Design a protein with these regions (language model features):
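Mobile cap/lid helix-loop segments that gate and shape the active-site cleft of serine hydrolases
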Residues: 25-31, 203, 210-253
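Primarily recognizes the serine-hydrolase "nucleophile elbow" in alpha/beta-hydrolase
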Residues: 149-220
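N-terminal cap/lid segment of alpha/beta-hydrolase-fold proteins
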Residues: 4, 13-64
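Short, surface-exposed "cap/lid" segments of acyl-processing enzymes
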Residues: 48-50, 54-106
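Alpha/beta-hydrolase active-site loop
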Residues: 134-158
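Conserved alpha/beta-hydrolase
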Residues: 94-125
């Protein structure tokens, strides 16, 4: 982690809902699958409000037997070098894995990777942020509102409802669980509140190397000011905002009614985010009715890796892909039993 300058609070307005003219229309009769769609805008707010989609098969609206996978990248809310394409290696391994497992392969209706506005990073060595660039001057709740807008776009386009798995790495895991928290991130009467009202939370979340308790992250690394700088840069200086934005403060028992499975993945070799972040979240879910036993109606699962550093999990992608495939398979098998 590196030091960077604090920034003024974002003056960016609410998410602008993308017009119907910009929406992507998929006609199974005129498309060849698998199909890849890249840099699709889901809002007009900035150049980073886009997503990419891999469709292994023709989409079937409201298909009760398939799952959409949605990935949210990490990068400390600010790194322009870690965007949606960072999922490429994992996605490639995942497609290879599932090609040998027809039931899991058939269960995946699509894979989407989301970009969202970043917080300032004027000290970035090769791509410093410009204070006039709306894509590089975000402040909470801009990030989560972008993610909600992207999910809403996907739900309206492909009509999969809550049948999706939200996957996030590092601060992407923070954002994934913020979606499940089902909170109003802006003022109650702010137009962006419609996003929280209209987005259906996922049935499962996979959090990898996640930041789940921001005050604890800052306190545990008090000797390294870069951690505080990172949180202030993305969230502002008010500790109460950090607490409220932390998934560790979420009411998942009542707020995430459709949540059936949460998978917390962390490597003991992670040099940036300590294992205690996942341990905190594990305890939170346990206290809120998520069991450990296979077959539990609401389940929590912990996967500890031993040999991969923070970014190596997605750079290599093999073990990451295995976790995703196992999660999809577990959901499918659980539904078959019921």
């Amino acid at each position: 982690m590196t030091h960077y300058s604090d920034s003024k609070k974002s003056t960016q307005g609410p998410i602008s809902k993308i017009s119907s003219a910009m929406a992507t229309t998929i006609s199974p009769a005129t498309k060849t699958y698998p199909l890849d769609l890249t840099n699709i805008p889901y809002a007009t707010t900035s150049d980073l409000n886009n997503l990419s989609i891999h469709l292994p098969q023709a989409p079937v609206p409201e298909d009760p037997n398939r799952l959409f996978l949605i990935y949210i990248h990490g990068g400390a809310w600010r790194d322009p070098a870690i965007l949606a394409p960072s999922f490429a290696a994992t996605q490639s391994h995942l497609l290879n894995l599932t090609s040998n497992n027809p039931s899991t392969q058939d269960a995946i209706s699509g894979i989407a990777t989301i970009n969202y506005r970043l917080s300032p990073y004027p000290a970035h060595p090769t791509n410093p942020s410009n204070p006039h660039d709306p894509s590089r001057n975000a402040r909470h709740p801009d990030h989560i509102n972008d993610v909600l807008a992207a999910i809403l776009y996907l739900q309206e386009t492909y009509a999969f409802g809550n049948r999706y798995v939200l996957i996030g790495h590092s601060c992407g895991a923070t954002l994934a669980l913020q979606v499940a928290m089902k909170r109003f991130w802006g003022s109650q009467y702010d137009p962006t509140s419609a996003l929280e009202l209209n987005v259906e939370p996922p049935i499962a979340v996979i959090g990898v190397s996640g930041i789940y308790d921001m005050p604890r992250l800052v306190d545990d690394n008090a000797a390294q000011p870069a951690y505080r700088d990172l949180v202030v840069n993305a969230m502002g200086s008010e500790r109460k905002v950090w607490e409220d934005a932390s998934p560790s403060s979420g009411d998942f028992e009542d707020g995430w009614e459709d949540g059936r499975l949460v998978v917390l993945v962390h490597s003991e070799a992670d040099e940036l985010v300590g294992l205690e972040q996942s341990e905190i979240m594990w305890k939170v879910f346990g206290e809120q009715g998520f069991g450990e036993e296979a077959g539990s109606q609401r389940r929590r699962k912990c996967i500890k890796l031993t040999d991969l550093k923070h970014d190596e999990i997605w750079e290599d992608g093999k073990k990451f892909a295995e976790v995703i495939a196992q999660t999809v398979d577990e959901i499918v098998r659980g539904e078959e039993k019921n």
